[in-house]
Amino acid sequence: MSQISEHSEFCNISPPLTAQSAAGGQGCERLAFPAEVCYNGCKKNVRRDVVLIAITNASLPSKKRILTVCVKLFLEQGYKKTTVVQQSSVSNSIFQNIFRAKDGVLAELVEFMFSNQFATARSMAGAQLPPAYVYAVETAIQMTLTELNENLREIYIEAYTQKEASDYIFRETAKELYQIFGSYQPELTAQDFFFMELGSAGIMRAYMAHPCDEELTLEKKLQMFLTMSLRSYHVPEDEIQKIIAFIGGMDIRTVSERVMHELFKALAMRFEFTL
């Protein structure tokens, strides 16, 4: 193992690849691995597909076990309190081969959670709504979820902070923003909306991180967020007021509780655990 420790964690793959088994590229001088597997000083050709295939095929059972345990614990006790390796009964090297760090698990969770959350939010909203209203419903529900459950608040804040998870959020949200608000600013490109999402995501994160109190009620928080975000996307002022009135007329807490229940159920099915 002393030889392996000189390399990055990606070298600790079983069964090992050999230079002959990898198509193309020269082998690492210190181990019988293709140079592509070594990220710690080897300067041969880089074929990242070899690394990804090796990790996936060798580690699927461990990956499933890690996700099952960790997603459950994230929901039950929060992101920060969860000790991944100890709870999932895998070695540190196996965990690092698959996820590198705890934020890798978070990224897997976020990708599934966001897609299901928004799909559920749309169905809960009921009638066919104009796109700007759908955006308001989705963001209002997300913000309300963080007021209903402190562990969800922590997950969302970390998701908007950690690079891998936040990159996914920014990228996917920007696509949705372009579809929803592109007609309000037809001169803007998809890339422009990505840059705008960086700002609106910062506003979202700040509001999620600040719990409601007697002065900053949930209703006030939603009104402030929607006013700023919709104005930034050039939604006309009279339409903004109608959207805010629509959200104000919803029982947003009850709707969000239903979304949270459906989200937890979907997560339990996807990652095979019970809460």
Tell me the role of every PLM-derived stretch.
Residues A132-I157, Q162-R171:
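Helical hydrophobic small-molecule/effector-binding pocket
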Residues A32, E36-V50, Q179, S183, ...:
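C-terminal peripheral helix-coil segments that are non-catalytic and often amphipathic
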Residues Q3, E9, Q26, E36, ...:
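Charged/polar low-complexity intrinsically disordered segments
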Residues R65-K72, G104-G126, V137, I141-Q142:
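Alpha-helical structural segments
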Residues A32, C38-Q77:
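Basic, helix-initiating cap at the start of DNA-binding domains
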Residues N12-I13, Y39:
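Short, positively charged and aromatic/hydrophobic N-terminal segments
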Residues E158-A209, L216, K220-T227:
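Amphipathic alpha-helical packing segments from all-alpha helical-bundle domains
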Residues L73-G104, E108:
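Helix-turn-helix
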